[in-house]
From Swiss-Prot:
EC numbers on record: 2.1.1.192
Gene3D superfamilies, A to Z: 1.10.150.530, Aldolase class I
Note: Reaction proceeds by a ping-pong mechanism involving intermediate methylation of a conserved cysteine residue.
Entry cofactors: [4Fe-4S] cluster
The protein, known as: Probable dual-specificity RNA methyltransferase RlmN
Keywords, sorted A to Z: 4Fe-4S, Cytoplasm, Disulfide bond, Iron, Iron-sulfur, Metal-binding, Methyltransferase, rRNA processing, S-adenosyl-L-methionine, Transferase, tRNA processing
Gene that produces this protein: rlmN
Record organism: Clostridium perfringens (strain 13 / Type A)
Any single biological process term in GO: tRNA methylation
Active site: 91, 332
Catalytic reaction(s) noted: adenosine(2503) in 23S rRNA + 2 reduced [2Fe-2S]-[ferredoxin] + 2 S-adenosyl-L-methionine = 2-methyladenosine(2503) in 23S rRNA + 5'-deoxyadenosine + L-methionine + 2 oxidized [2Fe-2S]-[ferredoxin] + S-adenosyl-L-homocysteine; adenosine(37) in tRNA + 2 reduced [2Fe-2S]-[ferredoxin] + 2 S-adenosyl-L-methionine = 2-methyladenosine(37) in tRNA + 5'-deoxyadenosine + L-methionine + 2 oxidized [2Fe-2S]-[ferredoxin] + S-adenosyl-L-homocysteine
Amino-acid positions noted as binding [4Fe-4S] cluster in the UniProt annotation, renumbered to this chain: 111, 115, 118
Disulfides per UniProt: 104-332
Length: 347
């Protein structure tokens, strides 16, 4: 049995022809799934019983079970805990902005990158999500919300470029006009800096916004909080980013989690300003999410403001990320981890 959400329209048309059906049936089925949010073959009214039988024998519509659905009383942020068919659990977050609804999706179950301040990496890597499983987060999120999701950020659990092929196919599926038709410029992909994959993605000349999890201004300091820094230097990452800008014309976002006493001094801000001065980029300053498993503390408001203002003196565009859903632990990995522990399950 295959997850039909993993299929492109052309792939499903080919299956139809191979199984004695008209190719146009593929579009009808996808209309039911993507336009009408019908996730059961039996409910597709203009599909013959014979074809429904064939579909049921060969495919399933991989919509996950909703285990928990939390809504923030502060800002309307929604956090969804989802159960997959194999018993694994993932989570996604919907954030409401003036310009529309944005969903933060997971691309892996767990993560093997080992970043010290991230909850999703604490139990290590379980497995990659397929393109259809990533897509299902958007589908179920949109159905639960009852409104269109217009923006996607690949910033949930997992390193997207460590699941490159599935993520690239997801981007194709979610952008397709027969599907959700979410434009590439409305999608942001966050990576800790897998240099070869950044360059490979640049060669596709996609219009996806690339966000780099930087979090330190020297290789030495970065190695203490991000193991990937032992493989790729900041210089190599910046070279890859400039290549991405050259190929796509898109501005790079640099994510910088501010950790009290670790990377939030005025000297750190000056070093970051010198590093990025003149580059087509934007810095997103993130007050770190505190988790029990480490001792990292959030920077003070005064230190955050000083850091921000110092960056601006170098002509570097920067903003402080608005904290959303703090009353429901909306940071990636937190809800999944607390749920698994509460049930006494193995991480």
């Amino acid at each position: 049995m295959k997850n039909i959400l993993d299929f492109t329209l052309e792939e499903l048309k080919e299956w139809m022809k191979e199984n004695g059906e008209s190719a146009f049936r593929a579009k009808q089925i996808f209309d039911w799934i993507y336009k009408k949010e019908v996730f059961n073959f039996e409910e597709m009214k203009n599909i013959s019983k014979a074809l429904i039988g064939k579909l049921s024998e060969n495919f399933y519509i991989g919509i996950p079970e909703v285990i928990d659905y939390l809504s923030s009383s502060e800002d309307g942020t929604r956090k969804i805990l989802l159960g997959l068919g194999d018993g694994n659990i993932i989570e996604c977050v919907i954030m409401r902005y003036k310009y529309g609804n944005s969903i933060c999706v997971s691309t892996q179950i767990g993560c093997r990158m080992g970043c010290k301040f991230c909850a999703s990496t604490l139990e290590g890597m379980v497995r990659n999500l397929t393109a259809g499983e990533i897509l299902s987060e958007v589908l179920i999120g949109q159905k639960l919300l009852g409104e269109r999701i217009s923006n996607i950020v690949l910033m949930g659990s997992g390193e997207p470029l460590d699941n490159y092929d599935n993520v690239m196919k997801f981007l194709e599926l979610v952008n397709a006009d027969y599907g959700l038709n979410i434009g590439q410029r409305h999608i942001t992909l966050s990576t800790c800096g897998l240099v070869p994959k950044i360059r490979e993605m640049a060669d596709k000349e996609m219009q996806v916004t690339l966000a780099i999890s930087l979090h330190a201004v020297s290789d030495e300091k970065r190695k203490t909080i991000m193991p990937i820094a032992n493989k790729y230097s900041i210089s190599e990452i910046l070279d890859a980013c400039n290549y991405y800008i050259e190929k796509t014309g898109r501005r790079i976002t640099f994510e910088y989690s501010l950790v009290s006493g670790v990377n939030d001094t005025k000297e750190d801000a000056k070093s970051l300003g010198r590093l990025l001065k003149g580059m087509l980029c934007h810095v997103n300053l993130i007050p770190v999410n505190e988790i029990k498993e480490n001792e990292f503390k959030k920077s003070t408001k005064k230190d955050i403001e000083t850091f921000l203002n110092t960056l601006k003196t170098y002509g570097v565009e920067a903003t402080v990320r608005r904290e959303m859903g703090s009353d429901i632990n909306a940071a990636c990995g937190q809800l999944r981890r607390s749920y698994i522990k509460s049930k006494g399950l193995k991480l």
